[in-house]
């Protein structure tokens, strides 16, 4: 199901679908820059509210599949943009789906390219380590019952912030999809769990 799957997600039909809307929104914000943070927040919030909670948690959230060009290619080879999308994929309600080769940095625009065999020589390089780190955050802190709330998504801004909350946990995520560093909002009693391209004052 390539579009809104609400009509299919019923007890007598399907329990989950491949969430191509998730990929589409990530493509337009992180990879292509077609929408600003406010537009991304609107799309993602609509996606969250569209499905009953049990179905939302079961959505197969993908960035790549055998039917679409590789996300890293959509990013023009910009690894930073791809990594932002992967962080969002791993730290968002649903089931993150990693298409083979993404953890090795595979690229491809045409069908023979994005379906080419796995690059085993580079299977455990920097991309593999990155996926392992972000997946480790998900495994350590999330259990699938968290509520998703947008914290920051201003018009014409490329800084997107959100929270995942449940009893005993408030995990905030800040993603700067712009080219310039962004100041981080001050947070009292907040522990930094993991960061990339960030200082104590700004997010690069």
Whereabouts are the PLM-identified features?
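Active-site-proximal helices and loops of the catalytic beta/alpha 8
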Residues: 1-53, 88, 107-133, 165, ...
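Carbohydrate-interacting/catalytic domains
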Residues: 42, 77-79, 93-98, 102-204
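Short, hydrophobic/aliphatic alpha-helical segments
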Residues: 80-91
């Amino acid at each position: 199901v390539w579009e809104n799957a609400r009509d299919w997600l019923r007890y007598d039909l399907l329990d989950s679908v491949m969430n191509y809307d998730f990929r589409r929104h990530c493509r337009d914000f992180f990879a292509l820059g077609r929408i600003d943070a406010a537009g991304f927040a609107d799309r993602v919030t609509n996606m969250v509210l569209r499905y009953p909670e049990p179905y939302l948690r079961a959505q197969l959230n993908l960035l790549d599949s055998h039917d679409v060009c590789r996300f890293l290619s959509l990013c023009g080879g910009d690894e930073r943009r791809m990594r932002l999308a992967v962080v969002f994929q791993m730290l968002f309600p649903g089931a993150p789906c990693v298409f083979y080769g993404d953890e090795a940095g595979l690229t491809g625009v045409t069908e023979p390219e994005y379906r080419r065999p796995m690059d085993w020589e580079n299977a455990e390089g920097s991309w593999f380590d990155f996926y392992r780190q972000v997946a480790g955050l998900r495994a350590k802190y999330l259990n699938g019952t968290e509520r998703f709330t947008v914290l920051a998504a201003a018009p014409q801004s490329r800084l997107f912030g959100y929270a995942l909350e449940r009893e005993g946990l408030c995990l905030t995520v800040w993603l700067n999809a712009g080219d310039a560093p962004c100041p981080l909002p001050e947070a009292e009693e907040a522990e930094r769990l993991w960061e990339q391209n960030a200082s104590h004052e700004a997010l690069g």
